[in-house]
């Protein structure tokens, strides 16, 4: 789950306007000029900057094209340099964490991709107050286990969720009856527009079911959570149950978790609607609706992102025909001409 599902395009210009990742994907003269400008501004970051960088390997779908320009950020102090490059060049920006909720078009992304990876994986737990501060790069399963071992409860649900804290905040990740909003107090973000850090309270994040008001220019740096005092052994048992359930009910392989948002959380699930439409196992090219869980799409080795989008489009149309519900993507779609349809 790396970033939010509220924008289908998944990227925008550093000025806050939506960026067209389709425009200039043939690496037009205008794009080349913008890339040159950004690359010059990023020179201080040396080998961390790469042109025509393949993005598929940075996602759990393992498919997708290249970014016109890519920079791997390894420390917070580099972010102002990235902000300057994005602002001056006008390139759309795509922030990539663990790539667990991201589908990049085969044609790629005509902009600046910023790879955070494990930028920072610090966890500071205060057992007295049951609060903690977790850096954006912390993996959700790691935090779930650490908090449980510390005798804190309320974050066990995250043990089976791929992705990091940064992406989880951006999309208000959740599962097993809870989500980030349930324990989130505030987040520290870096704004690529003004080049500064800002602390935002939960009320300022516009958190909804698998969505937030955070956009591409907002780089989540850390999150402060309020949990409950609990029993370490009880939490450990709950974690084991969640892990066992996920192994039994969700597929492995190349996928990005739940594809569509549940239309009515707690009442109407996307998976049930897809199943009722008879689409379990339905295939388009290299993409198939999982036999194990209908709200998962699995991709073959050397698969195509465009097949995934085609299957998503077909599934949504069939579900709307059979149930009247119009599904919304939980995955971030980047670089597709018609990605805005989701």
Predicted regions and their residues:
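Intrinsically disordered, low-complexity terminal tails and inter-domain linkers enriched
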Residues: 1-37, 127
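Anion-binding (especially nucleotide phosphate/pyrophosphate-binding) glycine-rich loop
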Residues: 24-27, 34-165
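Residues embedded in well-ordered beta-strands within globular domains across many folds
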Residues: 113, 156, 188, 331-332
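A gly/ser-rich beta-alpha-beta helix-loop segment of oxidoreductase catalytic cores
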Residues: 141-185, 255, 261
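Structural signature of FAD isoalloxazine-binding scaffolds in flavoprotein oxidoreductases
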Residues: 64-65, 69-76, 103-121, 170-202, ...
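Phosphate/pyrophosphate- and phosphate-bearing ligand-binding catalytic cores of soluble enzymes
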Residues: 2-4, 50-51, 59, 63, ...
